[in-house]
Amino acid sequence: MSLTKAETAKIIAEYGVKEGDTGSPEVQVALLTHNINKLQGHFADHKKDHHSRRGLLRMVSQRRKLLDYLKGKNAERYLDLIKRLGLRR
């Protein structure tokens, strides 16, 4: 269920603030969102996979924390990111 190197590089290039940027909140949220979307497809087939569901909830929580941090630091970047990712809120 993890991302390939090509997928990761594509997301980093699209959401990175500068070249080789892997630590900015935008990149981290985009990577988590991609992983979350992949796992949601997994749960359509495997409804009783509770172990993986715990990992999904952990990722959702981490994404929420990063979004809250970004909203507090720079609301404009936050609004741009949630619009680009198609997230609610």
UniProtKB/Swiss-Prot annotation:
One of the primary rRNA binding proteins, it binds directly to 16S rRNA where it helps nucleate assembly of the platform of the 30S subunit by binding and bridging several RNA helices of the 16S rRNA. Forms an intersubunit bridge (bridge B4) with the 23S rRNA of the 50S subunit in the ribosome. It comes from the Bacteria. The gene is rpsO. GO terms for biological process: translation. The lineage of its organism: Bacteria, Pseudomonadati, Pseudomonadota, Gammaproteobacteria, Alteromonadales. One of its GO terms (cellular component) is cytosolic small ribosomal subunit. Keywords: Ribonucleoprotein, Ribosomal protein, RNA-binding, rRNA-binding. The keyword Ion transport does not apply. It comes from Alteromonas mediterranea (strain DSM 17117 / CIP 110805 / LMG 28347 / Deep ecotype). It holds the Pfam family Ribosomal_S15. This is Small ribosomal subunit protein uS15. Part of the 30S ribosomal subunit. Forms a bridge to the 50S subunit in the 70S ribosome, contacting the 23S rRNA. Belongs to the universal ribosomal protein uS15 family. SMART domains: Ribosomal_S15. GO terms for molecular function: rRNA binding; structural constituent of ribosome.
